[in-house]
Regions:
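N-terminal low-complexity segments enriched in Gly/Pro/Tyr/Ser
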Residues: 1-173
Length: 173
């Protein structure tokens, strides 16, 4: 899908980095400012004087990500707009890509990252495996069996193997 194509370049990023990047993408002007600031080889002490969103400030610790976002500003802007308007759909698309990568053996534990899959339940419709619980309701002499769906699905998380290290995976989406 178009949404999967949009998130493919970042879907396999560690969760914490991905979260910062998604929020930062909603501030494309600040991405440009941060990229320019980083190009000057700044004194990091001057970072606190910047009036940027916290996500942008934290991403300056990962200059290659800021550079990538700046180099692909149309993509960054589209990602930010989509994340603001459809955050659940963005996260679902990321999970679909992670599932494909896990199933194909591409996404797995490495010395740099720990990949975990766990089943979760949610009371909102989405793709996944459905389990139902029945509730009977009488209406006009007929009994209607309502079955609210409780979705069971797998969520794949990616964490750094070393908590003090940010790993930016390199892959061709």
């Amino acid at each position: 899908t178009d949404l999967e194509s949009l998130v493919a370049p970042i879907a396999l990023y560690p969760d914490q980095l991905l979260a910062e990047l998604l929020v930062a993408s909603t501030y494309p002007l600040e991405v440009v400012q941060a990229a320019r600031w980083l190009e000057t080889k700044p004194d990091l002490a001057t970072l606190s004087s910047k009036d940027w969103d916290a996500s942008i400030m934290r991403l300056t610790a990962v200059p290659q990500v800021v550079k990538m976002m700046n180099d692909h500003l149309d993509w960054t802007t589209q990602l930010g707009d989509t994340f603001l308007s459809k955050p659940s759909e963005v996260m679902d698309a990321i999970q679909k890509l992670r599932k494909r990568a896990t199933d194909s053996g591409f996404l797995k534990d490495t010395p740099e990252q720990k990949v975990t899959a766990k089943a979760v339940s949610a009371e909102q419709p989405a793709e996944g495996t459905w389990a139902t619980e029945g509730t009977s309701v009488e209406s006009g002499g007929a009994t209607i069996k309502a079955t609210p769906a409780v979705m069971k699905r797998e969520v794949i998380t990616i964490e750094p193997a070393k908590t003090d290290t940010v790993y930016v995976p390199q892959y061709n989406p």
